Amino acid sequence: MLPLKQSEEALKDKRRLRWACRRGMLELDVLFEPFVDQAYDELSEEQKAVFRRLITCDDPDLFAWFMGHQKCEDEELAEMIRFMLSRVKV
C-alpha cells in the first residue's frame, strides 16, 4: 500500500503544481502547463526544486525572460528557462 500512497501524493503535488502554473498571461500558460504535463516527471529532484522556485517569480519577469527581453541573472533559473524552451514547442 505504501507505493500507492506515494503515487497519490505525487499526483496531488502535480495537481497543485499545475494550478500554480496558471498565470495571468496566456503567453506563460502555454509554456508552463505543457511543460508540467510533458517534462516535469523527468526532472531530477534538484531540477524540480528550481522549477518550483521559477514559478514563484513575478509574471512580468517571467515574460521578459522567456521572450528574451531580459536576461535572468540567476543561472539556475536561466538554465531551467532554456530547458523549458527546448522542450515546449509553441
Swiss-Prot record:
GO terms for cellular component: cytoplasm. It is found in: Cytoplasm. Signal peptide: none annotated. Keywords: Chaperone, Cytoplasm. GO terms for biological process: succinate metabolic process. Coiled coil: none annotated. The keyword Chaperone applies. SUPFAM superfamilies: YgfY-like (SSF109910). Belongs to the SdhE FAD assembly factor family. An FAD assembly protein, which accelerates covalent attachment of the cofactor into other proteins. Plays an essential role in the assembly of succinate dehydrogenase (SDH, respiratory complex II), an enzyme complex that is a component of both the tricarboxylic acid cycle and the electron transport chain, and which couples the oxidation of succinate to fumarate with the reduction of ubiquinone (coenzyme Q) to ubiquinol. Required for flavinylation (covalent attachment of FAD) of the flavoprotein subunit SdhA of SDH and other flavinylated proteins as well. This is FAD assembly factor SdhE. It comes from Idiomarina loihiensis (strain ATCC BAA-735 / DSM 15497 / L2-TR).
